[in-house]
Amino acid sequence: MTSFFDSPSKVIGASIALRAVLLVYGAWQDAHSPIKYTDIDYFVFTDAARYVSRGASPYARDTYRYTPLLAWLLLPTTWDSIPGFFAFGKALFALADVVAGWLIAKVLVSAYGMSPSRALKYASVWLLNPMVANISTRGSSEGLLGVLVVGLLWAVLSRRVSLAGVILGLGVHFKIYPFIYGPAVVWWFDAERDGSGSPRGTATARAAREKDDGQDGQGILSKAVDFLTPARIHLTLVALATFSALNVSMYILYDLPFAQNTYLHHLTRIDHRHNFSPYSTLLYLSAAGGARTAFESLAFIPQLLLSVVVIPLVLGKKSLAGTMLAQTFAFVTFNKVCTSQYFLWYLIFLPFYLPSSSLMKNPRKGILVGLLWVIAQALWLQQGYNLEFLGLSSFVPGLFLASLFFFAVNVWILGIIVEDVGGSA
């Protein structure tokens, strides 16, 4: 297999071929099977695009909870006169997968010092992953986020501060969750890494600190001055400007439905179907009772405390990619809604984490982690099949216990990731 990974064209070609085969198979399954290959969300996307093509708002389509940019990108799916163009969005998402994989290899070579062949091996964890290819070819837009997230990592590690700010602002506008990377990126960009001086700050700041050593108030002020490096300020301003410009533009075009569906809806979202989260049963009971409870908003507290505060502060100076992996894993694990598409949010960081991880150094441990993660999903899916296809009431105890087991496995894996990243140089 060494010769295979020595050729970027072969690896990229194989990843494209995998997705092409799945696209063709998906079209066949949709036409011949009662169980459809295409994700229901894809029909939501394309319906929204059709409304836009008629001069209406994408939010005229019920359950469209995304930026208008996505509906705009899928306008070619409304060109009914051109055969096959309804699948344009799937092809776009699949292509985005491949671009994200190419960026992964690029970062591994430029920032991690890997040889191109070794970088392609690890990038293939994403490029040749059938789960990744399946989700994108079913019509999930996560591949687009993959490009933005890896693009953000590349821009930061390349010290392209303006570009990193633009990508971060665009990513948060496109889908809320990339905001968690803001603290990690800002914390990582100290004075040493942005080239403006030593990590202890400028000469003026150091002189002030030495003069006021022992004075707590002045010491805190000095640390605050040290923290505000040019790169951190620049990145924050560019990201906020990009995010604000996009949101103001969309609000002018689509008014309150844009804000409500794209952002506010997620604060009190109730979604108990296809949900791996242990909150799913509580969401089901809440929906069945017709009453909203405080936990729908309180559920954000442990999730955000871990992913936005604790993990970036503890790990941010160790490894940026490793920190982003831990943040994303915590965010998804503790989210009140967790679907298969969300797994792609953290799987994209595996090529950066695996080379120095304990899972590679101890293969038995790696195999055990992989098996438990798959088994936990399989147990949940078996209960979900009983509910969705057999009509059995399996919310309690079946789905609830399966969700708790999956949650426990993921918390254990998160602990391994944090320990590995925390121990890195």
From Swiss-Prot:
What UniProt keywords apply to this chain's record, in alphabetical order?
Cell wall biogenesis/degradation, Endoplasmic reticulum, Glycosyltransferase, GPI-anchor biosynthesis, Membrane, Transferase, Transmembrane, Transmembrane helix
Q: What is its EC number?
A: 2.4.1.-
- Topologically, how does it sit relative to the membrane? Multi-pass membrane protein
- Which residue stretches, if any, does this entry annotate as coiled coil? none
Q: In which pathway does it act?
A: Glycolipid biosynthesis; glycosylphosphatidylinositol-anchor biosynthesis
Q: What are the boundaries of the signal sequence?
A: none
Compartment annotation: Endoplasmic reticulum membrane
Molecular functions per Gene Ontology: alpha-1,4-mannosyltransferase activity; glycolipid mannosyltransferase activity; mannosyltransferase activity
Q: Which domain of life is it from?
A: Eukaryota
Coarse class of the primary localization is endoplasmic reticulum
| GO BP of this protein | cell wall organization; GPI anchor biosynthetic process
**A single cellular component GO annotation:** glycosylphosphatidylinositol-mannosyltransferase I complex
Report TM segments. Answer: 11-31, 85-105, 144-164, 166-186, 233-253, 295-315, 340-360, 367-387, 398-418
What cystine linkages occur within this chain?
none
Indicate the family of this protein.
Belongs to the PIGM family.
Known function: Mannosyltransferase involved in glycosylphosphatidylinositol-anchor biosynthesis. Transfers the first alpha-1,4-mannose to GlcN-acyl-PI during GPI precursor assembly. Required for cell wall integrity.
Name this polypeptide is given:
GPI mannosyltransferase 1
Q: Which organism is it from?
A: Aspergillus fumigatus (strain ATCC MYA-4609 / CBS 101355 / FGSC A1100 / Af293) (Neosartorya fumigata)
**Organism phylogeny:** Eukaryota, Fungi, Dikarya, Ascomycota, Pezizomycotina
**Which gene codes for it?**
gpi14
